[in-house]
Amino acid sequence: MKRLAIYIHGKGGNAGEAAHYQPLFATWSVVGMAYHAQTPWEACQEFPRLFDQLAEGYDDVALIAGSIGAYFAMLSLADKPISQAYLISPVVDMERLITDMMGWARVTEEELRRRGVIATDFGEPLKWEYLCYAREHPIAWRIPTHILYAGQDHLTTRETITAFAVRTGATLTVMEAGEHWFHTPEQMAFLDAWVNRVRDAGEA
């Protein structure tokens, strides 16, 4: 059986990060998806085509995705033949995240609707179009999924991630000292141990 794990990076990442996962999926091919989408509507145009190109000729395809990449993947690839998904710090409720960001920036919904785009001090512009899209396109995800969440994640609350895991039937593992971006040696060791544990459980 030919097996493939497709890695989808988050903001600021790149497809080359997939190399980290090759030792964890030693009998699989592991490849990063080199994408250009910066919005969910762009991802819904681009991701299905890239997935089909990468998955051609494989009998089993798994997904590894992080942060905004996981959000894009869940919106655009829900109907693809994916056997397992491994999501690291996924954004699972974009509407909640945007409204939280509006609160941080002290921007009202009426103001955002009127102005369309508002710059913020924390670097992420608020966009009315994005908020509307998130509301009109909720995630509908039924693929067997394992989630790794950081106790110090500043983008997704524990309440939000727990509710999503319950709704989708996903397993949820929490690294209490972890951050949204898993990058320190301790965090990466925890991530690797998590992959090994849930992968082996899924193959049992």
Regions found by a protein language model. Give the residues of each.
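Short coil/turn segments at beta-strand junctions that form active-site/ligand-binding loops
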Residues: K2-R3, Y58-V61, S83, I143-P144
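Short hydrophobic segments within beta-strands
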Residues: I6-K11, I64, I88, L148
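Catalytic nucleophile-loop/oxyanion-hole region of alpha/beta-hydrolase
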Residues: G32-G57
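Gly/Ala-rich beta-loop-alpha elbow adjacent to hydrolase catalytic centers
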Residues: I64-A73
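Aromatic pocket-lining residues of Rossmann-like dinucleotide-binding sites
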Residues: S76-K80
